[in-house]
Each structure stands twice: as C-alpha cells, then as structure tokens.
Amino acid sequence: MNASLNKKLGNVKWGDYKMGELFQRVKTNKLPYKADELPNQPLGEYTLPCLTSSFNNQGLNYYAPREGATILQNVISIPSNSDVYRAYYQPNDFTVLSDAYAIRWIFDDRELSSRQYLFMVMCINKVTDLPVYSYKNKLGGWNVVKNKHIQLPQKRGEIDFDFMESFIAELEAERVAELSAYLTVSGLDNYELSNNEMAIIERYKKHQIPFSEFEFIKIFNNIKQGRRLKKDDQLPGDI
C-alpha cells in the first residue's frame, strides 16, 4: 500500500462500534448434504457454491442444487469452526453448508456498496483473523463475534461511508496500475484473446468443459522426496 493510502488511514478519525449493532446473522435452510458428498465443481444441477469453514476460495469449495437452498449475495461470511477465522465479502450467489455463517448490514435505510463491504471486512478481520484463534482455541460463532468491537472511520460523529468508498477505489486503482506496469515490463501487455480462446472461456462459463480426476503419479512421474530436516540442521538467527 502506497504512502498516500497509509497517510489517509493515519489521518482519519476512528470510532468504536459493536458488531451486533451493525450486522445481523442471516438465517439459512439446513442442507441435507455433507461436504464430501458434494462435487467441488459445478456439475448438472449442482451449481450453487456452498460455504464451509475453509479459507480457500473464500470458503466456497463445493456445489449444491439451488432448490431448497437459501441463496445469499452481498453479505459477509465468517467461519464458526476453523483454524483461520477470516471474513470475506461474498458478492455473488451462494449458500451456507456447514461450520460458517453469513451476516448482513442491519440498517434498511442504507445499502452498502461492494467497496464499503470490502472496507468493513478489512476492519472485521482485525478482530477475528488473529493468530491466537485456531481449532484448539476457537473464536466461536456469531454469539461471540456480535459482541466484538471494530474500528470504523468517522466524520462528524457518524460512520464515514464516503471515506471507505474512496479508499477502496484508490486501493483498487493502485493494484491495477501495479499489474499493468508488471505486464508491460514483462512483455505480457498484449493480452487480446483470439476468437478460439474466447469461445473456450464461454464454454467454461457454461460448464461445457468436462473435468476428470487424475492421480499425481500419472501426471508427475518423477516425484522425488527431499531430505528430511532434523533439529541438528537448525541454525540460530533472526528472521
């Protein structure tokens, strides 16, 4: 993050807010599936992403039928039984499967934009996504998290939504500029797709490309195990 954005964070006034006074947990239908019974890619009627406690792919690693499921979008997801309690903004359709839940902005007179949700997720993770929490030392579910306090930018005693919007917009622009510069230097800035490549992408979006499972040994046939390090291999030093 550049100096300008760091300066903005340092200069803004912050206020203390209780999670349960800003968000409410979303009630969802319990699905009659276990994770290991579901495909990990869209297949037939199994097209709705399912939320679990995993922090890979924002917790969405399985797919279920849409029928009978509570379909959510534009909410925040948080694991309730995990090794990592990282919150994510979920802009697209999904449902809750297990060991996680979704929360929604509680006030009807203001609908949060995606950038404002992203900023709040950043603030929430400062109190949930901490090394102290793990499977052995669980954070707990919404009954615990709703009593946590987060810091949000303020202006004249009110939450400064405009600051959140402009901050995330500037952060996005910075990341795009960095990527553009990298692609230019690497000679990869000419990324216009051919008609064939565009057709393949469309087939993938429509789930028309078949996938199959393969054993590692059949694809990578020269797997070598490295030497196992022992305590004697350790050297004193600072990281």
Where in this protein do the model-derived segments appear?
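DNA target-recognition domains and sequence-specific DNA-contacting regions of bacterial/archaeal
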Residues: 20-147, 215-239
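Non-catalytic DNA-recognition/assembly elements of restriction-modification systems
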Residues: 1-57, 155-239
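An amphipathic, hydrophobic-aromatic interaction surface with interspersed Lys/Arg
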Residues: 147-155
